[in-house]
């Protein structure tokens, strides 16, 4: 049995002072890590082969709580994001995002809530939890939490990525 490696960490790998860093996702094909800063409305990406100096940050005009790959699409080009009011397709090259599906049909809920966290299930469905936004204060047990699911009907195909038909 091989010995256990240990490291002494004396400083942060990335010292970027997130307001609320969440949603880490490892992109195996490019050896990169992406994660969001919900409060500061940012998506951070770092190439683990190159180190902290490769950090790229994309600034949004809304909080983003989660990201997901799109089946059959290069994640360095496009991914899904759970944003303030719905699911968006993010064009990472153009740094533009387009609303794919709103979470709610009412303006009141759209204003009060934001995406929080989510994941792709084995059937390729993108599940996203929503909760009251930061400007409302601490989360309250007020019946404002919900879970949304987005999926495309692709027969019996199973994938850990969201199927997007464009």
Locations of regions flagged by a protein language model:
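Residue-level detector of Asp-centered blade-edge/turn motifs that repeat once per structural unit
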Residues: 26-30, 70-76, 120-123
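Beta-propeller blade signature
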Residues: 142-153
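Beta-rich catalytic cores
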Residues: 20, 63, 75, 114, ...
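Beta-strand-rich domains and repeat architectures in extracellular enzymes and scaffolds
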Residues: 10-42, 63-67
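Asp-box/WD-like beta-propeller blade repeats and closely related beta-sheet repeat scaffolds
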Residues: 93-137, 141-143, 159
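Blade-loop segments of beta-propeller domains
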Residues: 50-87, 98-114
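Beta-propeller domains
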Residues: 28-60, 84-93
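Conserved beta-propeller blade signature
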Residues: 32-34, 78-80, 125-127
């Amino acid at each position: 049995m091989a010995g256990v490696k240990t490291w002494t960490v004396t400083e942060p790998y990335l010292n970027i002072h997130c307001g609320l860093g969440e949603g880490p996702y490892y992109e195996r094909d490019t050896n990169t890590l992406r994660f969001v800063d919900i409060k500061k409305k940012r998506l951070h990406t770092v190439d683990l082969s190159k180190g902290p100096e490769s950090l790229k940050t994309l600034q949004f005009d809304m909080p983003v709580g989660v990201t997901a790959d799109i089946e059959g699409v290069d994640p360095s080009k496009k991914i899904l994001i759970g944003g303030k009011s719905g699911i968006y397709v993010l064009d990472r090259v153009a740094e533009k995002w387009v609303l794919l599906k709103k979470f709610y049909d009412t303006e009141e809920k759209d204003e009060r809530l934001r995406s929080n966290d989510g994941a792709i299930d084995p059937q390729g469905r993108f599940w996203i939890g929503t909760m009251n936004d930061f400007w409302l204060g601490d989360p309250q047990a007020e019946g404002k939490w919900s879970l949304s699911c987005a999926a495309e009907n692709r027969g019996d195909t199973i994938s850990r990525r969201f199927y997007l038909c464009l």
